Amino acid sequence: MALATEPADLTKERLMDAAEGLFAEYGIEAVSARQIALAAGQRNQSAIRYHFGSKDDLVAALHAQRITEINERRAELLDAPGVASDMRALIGAIATPLAERVERDAGGSAYVRFLAHLFSDRQRRDLLIEHGESAALLRRIYADLRRLASAIPEPLFSERLRLLVGGIIHALADRERLRAKGGAGPFVLGQAAFVNNLIDAGIGILTAPPSPATLAHLASPKEHARGTNG
């Protein structure tokens, strides 16, 4: 149990670690501030309010801290020669830092599962792109991919990119959930092949020609009105 004299920074770290594990397992909405405090060994049930302000503030702080390392690796990949003209490398810059984080230590598994819950929460999803460095890197990736997939009209491209990013996050998270429940699970592919296959699938998502049916719906004023409303 955490000591009353424990430094504030260490207490905050304990709270974030506990929150990440609980969010990964049960989802963000299902976990209370009280549960997080107890899991972190805090006797004071208002520890979240004292150190962060609210549970939402804790979620934001947790994501901001964890994404820093991901962003550093992503920037490194994007700065490699020729990446701006290589769709596979650009999609790899989305997937690879997350996959590497998962493989490096057990905390990476909890992080990617937490990230999947965050991405699925429409009200919190903007946290994924509002972090300053994240926003700049994602704009850079978007611009390069948009240029390379110029044959795909809007809003199809933006929707496909959202599906691509969500698919990568959820595929990694689902794999980690299987691992967490006991061993390797029914995995056909090793981790490296799994990630490369994700990237291959991403290329297909972004470049597959839209069908006449999709284009017809895209041209329908009724379809645009429905999309605007939700």
Label each residue range with its predicted role.
Residues N44, D56, A106, F119-R124, ...:
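Short alpha-helix boundary/capping elements
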Residues A135-G230:
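C-terminal peripheral helix-coil segments that are non-catalytic and often amphipathic
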Residues A75-Y111, L161:
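Hydrophobic alpha-helical connector segments
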Residues I94, L98, V112-F119, L164-I168, ...:
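Short alpha-helical scaffolding segments that buttress acidic/His motifs in well-ordered protein cores
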Residues A89, G107-A110, Q123-A149, E159:
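Amphipathic alpha-helical packing segments from all-alpha helical-bundle domains
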Residues K12-D17, F52-A75, D79:
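An amphipathic alpha-helix adjacent to DNA-recognition modules
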Residues L15-F23, G202:
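Short hydrophobic clusters on alpha-helical segments that form packing/core surfaces
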Residues L22, E29-D57, A61:
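Helix-turn-helix
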